[in-house]
Amino acid sequence: KLIRFGIIQYICRKHFIMGKLYLIPNLLGETAIGGVIPEDVVHIIKNIKVFATENVKNTRRYLKKIEKSINIDELTFLDLNEHSDIKDIETYVPYLADQDVGIISEAGCPGIADPGAELVALAHKHNYQVIPLVGPSSILLALIASGANGQNFSFNGYLPVTRPERIKALKVFEKQSAVENRTQLFIETPYRNLQLFEDIISALSPTTRLTIACDITTENEYIKTMSIKDWKHVKPDINKRPAIFVLYARSF
């Protein structure tokens, strides 16, 4: 297989027909395509026939929303999720020898808090062009809407599931934020949002700022920054809704 791939790659490069790897943004929720996905990006998506995707069903639905006339049955879908083995991902690289491939995650931009990095690294290794496309990223949008430091920040993914470990992690983030003037971003499984919120307001300093950015880009978007002290008087409606939490250990 590797020898065959090498021959195909050589022929395609000789005739300048190498594919490109496109990092394709997905919607963050129920939003009109035209509101968040540029027309140029839509045009590129419509011409791709192979997709490495986190969730095939979700991707099929997204592509139909992009363009109803797309023939889904003519497309190739490659699984690219937390269960994908690197050996399986390596078998996707030959598709790039003579055609473009797109990576699509379930929501937002692939490669950040979502699968995609391994295939991107392999594309670079084999000298294929990697092209990130413009679209919504909940992490970036939450950060710029928070009022926190955008020069020094960390995205920490999911916090520990057990409460003692979660509170310990929160205090570490708060200390780092205070000492290094660093903004800390993290997420939680939507049905545990309120548990995380309660831990934040009970364990952290009253002057630390907390931003909750929920359902970003949708009609139900909710973005609010307040001190922990002020959050104690509010119960945000964030249960089972996708949210980004932003901590910044600076008072207003």
Ranges and model annotations:
Residues 17-80:
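Glycine-rich, flexible N-terminal cofactor/catalytic loop recognition
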Residues 19-22, 100, 179-252:
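A contiguous loop/helix-start segment that scaffolds small-molecule binding in enzyme catalytic cores
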Residues 1-17:
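Short, Lys/Arg-enriched N-terminal segments with co-localized hydrophobic residues
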Residues 45-51, 128-131, 183-184:
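Short active-site oxyanion
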